[in-house]
């Protein structure tokens, strides 16, 4: 499985080792959440402690970078 349909690993630092399929399944939720102004609801915290920092821009660039 590649990361092509999800988050680009070259743009992110992760503080834990996370399976690629986990990131891919989260990518749509992250993209939608960026538009709504929050990452995860309180009762939907991901089991892995994930901190992603976009190198080139801000969180607003995630949707642009993954939808081309």
Curated annotation (Swiss-Prot):
The protein's name is MEC1-mediated checkpoint protein HUG1
Q: Which domain of life is it from?
A: Eukaryota
Biological processes per GO annotation:
DNA damage checkpoint signaling; DNA damage response; DNA repair
Tell me the compartments it is located in. Cytoplasm; Nucleus
Organism equals Saccharomyces cerevisiae (strain ATCC 204508 / S288c) (Baker's yeast)
This entry's comment on induction and repression of expression is: By replication arrest and DNA damage. Repressed by CYC8, RFX1 and TUP1.
Instruction: Give GO terms: molecular function aspect only.
Output: ribonucleoside-diphosphate reductase inhibitor activity
Q: Which UniProt keywords apply?
A: Cytoplasm, DNA damage, DNA repair, Nucleus
- Gene that encodes the chain: HUG1
Which GO CC annotations does the UniProt entry carry?
Answer: cytoplasm; nucleus
Function of the molecule? Involved in the MEC1-mediated checkpoint response to DNA damage and replication arrest.
């Amino acid at each position: 499985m590649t990361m092509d349909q999800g988050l680009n690993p070259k743009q992110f630092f992760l503080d834990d080792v996370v399976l690629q399929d986990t990131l891919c399944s989260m990518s749509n939720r992250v993209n939608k959440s960026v538009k709504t102004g929050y990452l995860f609801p309180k009762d939907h915290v991901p089991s892995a402690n994930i901190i992603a920092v976009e190198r080139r821009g801000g969180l607003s660039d995630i949707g642009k970078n993954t939808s081309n």
